[in-house]
Regions:
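Short amphipathic alpha-helix with an adjacent loop that forms part of the alpha/beta core around
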Residues: 15-21, 87-89, 108-116, 190-192
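Acidic, histidine-bearing metal-coordination/catalytic regions of metal-dependent phosphoesterases
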Residues: 1-14, 183, 192
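Core catalytic region of metal-dependent phosphoesterases/phosphodiesterases
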Residues: 6-88
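Binuclear metal-dependent phosphoesterase catalytic core
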Residues: 85-89, 146, 150-151, 155, ...
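Active-site neighborhood of phospho(di)ester-bond hydrolases with catalytic His/Asp-centered motifs
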Residues: 5-7, 25-30, 56-61, 81-82, ...
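Binuclear metal-dependent hydrolase catalytic cores centered on His/Asp/Glu-rich metal-binding motifs
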Residues: 91-121, 138-147
């Protein structure tokens, strides 16, 4: 399965041109810049129009207007994951968004603890601590995402940090992908 991974488009998704062929396109958050409903509607319209068989997205820290939202009337091939998952062609995707409310309320360890052990592709907005998370010599990843090493998915896809954009295979054959350069027209293509 080919996965096109994009993230952190911050309302500039229309700048992504000539995207490669893939079976699934995944957006790991920060679809908006200001977090407005208008930005979300524009993104969803664009995302639904993409020529991929399956489309999955989660929310990032800029997408707070989606906190507690129930997105209805999405086409059958478009999936918004909010602490839940979907199986596509036998591959189990699970998505955990990044909402400031959950972070401030201390809910992230519980939410990460719910990641199913049989997850194949984990989607979060933020990286785990120490993996593709360094900016200016400081690691900004989330310590509570250590659950990734218990689950050991085939891939962990995220964004959030714009200066470490690459795919890298690390530790116990888990492939980590940071595609946070979406607003600059960058993406990652993975095969699992």
């Amino acid at each position: 399965m080919k996965i096109l991974h994009i993230s952190d488009t911050h309302g500039k998704h229309h700048q992504l041109k000539d995207l490669p062929e893939a079976d699934v396109v995944v957006h790991t958050g920060d679809i908006t810049e200001e977090g407005t409903e208008e930005e979300v509607k524009d993104f969803i319209e664009w995302f639904c129009s993409l020529p991929y068989k399956h489309k999955i997205f989660i929310a990032g820290n800029h997408d707070d207007c989606l906190y507690g939202a129930n997105i209805e009337d999405l086409p059958d091939d478009v999936h918004y994951l909010c602490n839940d998952g979907i199986t596509i062609d036998g591959i189990k995707f699970y998505g955990v968004p990044m909402f400031l409310h959950d972070d401030l309320d201390g809910n992230l360890p519980e939410l990460f603890g719910r990641i199913p052990d049989d997850t194949d592709v984990l989607l979060t907005h933020q990286p785990p601590l120490g993996i593709l998370d360094e900016q200016d010599g400081i690691n900004y990843g989330d310590y509570t995402l250590k659950r990734v090493m218990d689950v050991r998915p085939k891939c962990h896809l995220f964004g959030h940090l714009h200066h470490t954009v690459k795919t890298q295979e690390v530790f116990r054959r888990v492939r980590f992908s940071n595609a946070a350069g979406g607003k600059y027209g960058r993406y990652e293509l993975l095969k699992i």
